[in-house]
From Swiss-Prot:
Gene3D superfamilies linked to this entry: D-tyrosyl-tRNA(Tyr) deacylase (3.50.80.10)
Record key words, sorted: Cytoplasm, Hydrolase, RNA-binding, tRNA-binding
Name of the protein: D-aminoacyl-tRNA deacylase
Subunit: Homodimer.
Biological classification of the source: Bacteria, Bacillati, Actinomycetota, Actinomycetes, Mycobacteriales
Organism: Mycobacterium avium (strain 104)
GO molecular function, one term: Gly-tRNA(Ala) deacylase activity
Length: 143
């Protein structure tokens, strides 16, 4: 499982013209793109959620748990792109939707269980993601 996390001052996910999840402007938070591979399980999802919740990448070396920062979770199978051969990425390392969707849901639920204010995109949808990257700070978490 991979989580590409960006510190943001605002972010929004839109599906079919409607905003489905957002971090309001000037409310420093985290945008977490979540990719799932075949060997991932619920335990990995929970451990990565805890790692993200306590990751000290906000202002003054604080974590989302320290300041109650909002987290926007967006599924992102392309985090498992293989570009080693040719010019067209392979997605073979990405888990199929039947495996990935429950694990992305588990990841978001684990964050909520830790006390996070979590919003999400829509799994499998064509999403438009807008964000203002703060710093910029972008970190790849992987288990």
């Amino acid at each position: 499982m991979r989580v590409l996390v960006q510190r943001v001052s605002s972010a929004a996910v839109t599906v079919e013209g409607a905003v489905v999840g957002a971090i309001r402007p000037d409310a420093q938070g985290l945008l977490a793109f979540v990719g799932v591979t075949h060997s991932d399980d619920r335990d990995k999802a929970r451990r990565l959620a805890e790692k993200l919740w306590k990751l000290r990448i906000l202002a003054d070396e604080r974590s989302a748990s320290d300041v109650g920062a909002p987290i926007l979770v967006v599924s992102q199978f392309t985090l498992y792109a293989d570009t080693a051969k040719g010019r067209r990425p392979s997605w073979n390392a990405a888990a199929p939707a039947a495996v990935a969707e429950p694990l992305v849901t588990e990841f978001a639920a684990a964050l909520q269980g830790l006390g996070a204010d979590v919003q999400t995109g829509v799994f499998g949808a064509n999403m438009q993601v807008e964000l203002v990257n703060d710093g910029p700070v972008t970190v790849l978490l992987e288990l």
